[in-house]
Amino acid sequence: YKRQTVAIMLILFGIFFLVVETWNKGKTAKIHSIGELTYTSALIIGAFQLIAAVFPGTSRSGATILGAILIGVSRTVAAEYTFFLAVPVMFGASALKLVKFGFHFTSAEAILLAVGMIVAFVVSILTIKFLMGYIKKHDFKAFGWYRIVLGAAVILYFVLAR
């Protein structure tokens, strides 16, 4: 990927988060539980994953959360659903890597892989728990600003590195 594209998409999606959160302020969500999602809303939210696949520097989770909020899903349900969507994506990516390596691992490599998976799982659970608690009290504007600052820092780094 071109670093300029990644930096620009970081900034653009940061701005998109700020715009969506400002537009959404004071509005009441229409969907308050995952059980209320329809096939149509699931299809729309899932389609937002394509944005992340097409544009490097775009967060898959961020894209699906924004898509969900835009169709009236509450922040907590949007984040929860996004994390559920990640399971098949990550499982598929991991399975693809295993197939690519032909399942040929030494005992030491298999142990390292297992330890890495366990640590990643525990850290993911803790991170999701923290994020869900944060989302219940805050909007995603901080994430938008983070993306803008990170994108600007990436641009600045490569300008100064010349």
Q: How should each PLM-predicted stretch be described?
A:
Residues 1-162:
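Multi-pass membrane proteins that catalyze or facilitate reactions on polyprenyl-/lipid-phosphate substrates
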